Amino acid sequence: MSLGNVGINADYSWDAGERARLLQSPSVGTSPELRRLAGGTSPAGAVFIVVNAALGAGLLNFPAAFNAAGGITAAISLQLVLLLFIISGLVILAHCADACSERTYQEVVRGVCGRTAGVLCEVLIAVYTFGTCIAFFIIIGDQLDKLLGAMMHTTAESPVPWYADRKFTISVTGVLLILPLSLPREISVQRYASFLSVLGTCYVTVVVVVRCIWPDTTIPSHEISSSSSSWLAVFNAVPTICFGYQCHVSSVPVYGSMQQQDIRRWGYIVTIAMFIALCVYTGTGVCGFLLFGSDVDQDVLLSFPSDDIAVAVARAFIILCVLTSYPILHYCGRAVLEGLWLRFTSQEPGEEPSKERRRRVLQTVIWFLLTLLLALFIPDIGRVISLIGGLAACFIFIFPGLCLIHLKLSEIHEHKSKSWWALLSYGVIMVTIGTFIFGQTTTKAIFVDLVG
């Protein structure tokens, strides 16, 4: 996830320094010269980047989301309805980026909706990336449990050695691999993350689809529900869908990097990209649900036997993707926090290197320790996705809707046309839907955590 998905796939084809400048707030010394990209992204390249931003860790949770929604028909129908708003939100953001001449999501929100909305957006981006980093640690623990179990030939009833304990393996992996990759001021690992992420997510989809068509004899048959017990059950899948398709934060700099910044062309690009993401997510969701039914785990790979070699390769791919993506997500969150810090302390960006280094190390260590500690005590990625999926609704619905409303209200017309009223009403509808999704999913997630 990218910062947009902020999931496994979080990479653009730019170097780390350029990405840092694009992610920082306007007050962090981002001059027009530094923000101007050499060349431009082709339409095909833009499609790949948007797909890369959308596909991510949410893929593992889609079969469980299909089960929670009450079956295949309900889940696919919900996806198609939400995709209309997801695609329109991407187009609205590009239109607003043209209107205010900004190149990042938070700058567009700040430029169109004002300072308060911009600060709120930056805070939510930081919280969203923080939550996704927690999900990454949980994914590492899930996959290592299965891989170590296969190597040691242990069963569910076997005692787990101390060196194979989940908390120990997550901690060691984090301290030895993730923390050193997260400390540098600039990150070079992201140039490899894009290829690994796309390859990993596609491989997981292929494995799940193939296992559904030619099931392993060791996988027992499971009950498949054809309808939900209540029409309200369909909302159980909303957080996963929002988390999976959320690429809106990444989309603004992608649009700004295009060779020809045309709204109509951009509409075609994001439609194609979302169709590709729909095929991948739906393929994984449908086949994973048909394989395991109501017994599917929150992470679909956990439902497969430990000794399945093809699935073991998929687990190794996912671990590698997460190891390269956590530093990128932390880097994005740190850039936003750094911008907020410099703005509210009225400091100039050109400070002493030693002071900046101490603050960066302190920020990184605190971020790392908090995400690690929370991941050790959260049982599965479903708990995290159910919470940050509500935040994803803010980036998909609320902020694009607010931008559209402010943009329309800023236009001076003596007589408002029907199209003006239609667009204003659409913005209000987006904000209303986003607020409902955020409130409903967040409240339910907190309630489940407190009760369970």
From Swiss-Prot:
Pfam families xref list: Aa_trans
One record GO biological process: amino acid transmembrane transport
KW Transport (keyword) present: yes
Highest taxon above the source species: Eukaryota
Transmembrane domains' residue ranges: 46-66, 74-94, 120-140, 168-188, 195-215, 234-256, 272-292, 309-329, 361-381, 385-405, 419-439
Main location: membrane
Record-linked InterPro entries: AA_transpt_TM (IPR013057)
Keywords from the UniProt entry: Amino-acid transport, Cell projection, Ion transport, Lysosome, Membrane, Sodium, Sodium transport, Transmembrane, Transmembrane helix, Transport
Protein localization: Lysosome membrane; Cell projection, Axon
Catalysis performed (reactions): L-asparagine(in) + Na(+)(in) = L-asparagine(out) + Na(+)(out); L-glutamine(in) + Na(+)(in) = L-glutamine(out) + Na(+)(out)
Topology in the lipid bilayer: Multi-pass membrane protein
Family: Belongs to the amino acid/polyamine transporter 2 family.
Name used for this protein in its record: Sodium-coupled neutral amino acid transporter 7
Protein source organism: Xenopus laevis
